[in-house]
Amino acid sequence: MTKNSNHDENEFISFEPNQNTKIRFEDADEDEVAEGSGVAGEETPQDESMFDAGESADTAEVTDDTTSADYYFDSYSHFGIHEEMLKDVVRTKTYQNVIYQNKFLIKDKIVLDVGAGTGILSLFCAKAGAAHVYAVECSQMADMAKEIVKANGFSDVITVLKGKIEEIELPTPKVDVIISEWMGYFLLFENMLDSVLYARDKWLVEGGVVLPDKASLHLTAIEDSEYKEDKIEFWNSVYGFDMSCIKKKAMMEPLVDTVDQNQIVTDSRLLKTMDISKMSSGDASFTAPFKLVAQRNDYIHALVAYFDVSFTMCHKLLGFSTGPKSRATHWKQTVLYLEDVLTICEGETITGTMSVSPNKKNPRDIDIKLSYSLNGQHCKISRTQHYKMR
């Protein structure tokens, strides 16, 4: 289902959600001014760029808490995932611009980098004049981060601590700034946000800064007959055999892929806004209403979720979007295929609710409940579907 974006890789279009706050979305070298979004359920104009039972407790599968944690951290020991993130210019350059263009947030401050990986954010902070940076990384990449810090001459400024943020002891009672790239697919996959909130509550001084401090989740609907036929309907006849029993399971697995903006059929709606500096851990579990209005006559095969992130403490508000009309990121978008093909006419609406919560067995996974209805001229339907991101 991977599609090619119509705009040049260096082209960025303004994003205009409904809010009075101006946000300048950053890419590699170009700046665009846009407006942020605020209220769940309100229309968010398409992101026109910058701103993805019954098992035993002793099972050997990743559903066991200890095993799942080990699996999660081990996955970040591989160089490939760090290469992908570092080469994500939207992601990495935005953080760099936030730090370098707003040194007043970092200079002479004690900084905590949660989930430091290779230490790139810590290096940015050290170069921007941080008094000291504590880079916490649980995976084996922590050993490489120490070498990277030493190779770049910042051993006296950056201390790499290997371990879980919930288990390590910082050599300082408080920090002035917490920085982290905690976002996963669908914003919340891998549940690293909880670690950031833990660090905030334990170490951040009153009035301290969290970077980024705002995130929002959005929803739209797309036509995607070709890919759904290839990936879902495929199970109806496999070399002449009926394997349709797999379809329901396949439908429950959200697809992370890049969506062509030409596939978009409806407007986009804000599902959830999170203030990382104030929210509690439980706020990441939510039920939000939505109303998607068709922009043309077409078929709908899936709903698509994406997220935006912003840094509101900067001189000029910075951030980025992972939506279909933005420059592609390694997060891509999250596609939720519908059991039925919806025939919709321009102006008709799909209404419903989406419930999101961590999986009870493995809190790094996400359970999604989607209820939707369409009362249109050619299609009348009301259905509830369940999805599991893992």
From Swiss-Prot:
Region Disordered: which residues? 1-59
Domain of life of the organism in this record?
Answer: Eukaryota
Residues at the active site: 181, 190
Gene3D superfamilies registered for this protein in UniProt: Hnrnp arginine n-methyltransferase1, Vaccinia Virus protein VP39
Give a yes or no for keyword Methyltransferase in this entry: yes
Stretches with biased composition (Basic and acidic residues): 1-10
Provide GO CC annotations from the record.
cytoplasm; nucleus
- GO MF term set: protein-arginine N-methyltransferase activity; protein-arginine omega-N asymmetric methyltransferase activity
Enzyme Commission identifier(s): 2.1.1.319
* Protein family: Belongs to the class I-like SAM-binding methyltransferase superfamily. Protein arginine N-methyltransferase family.
Q: What is this protein called?
A: Protein arginine N-methyltransferase 1.1
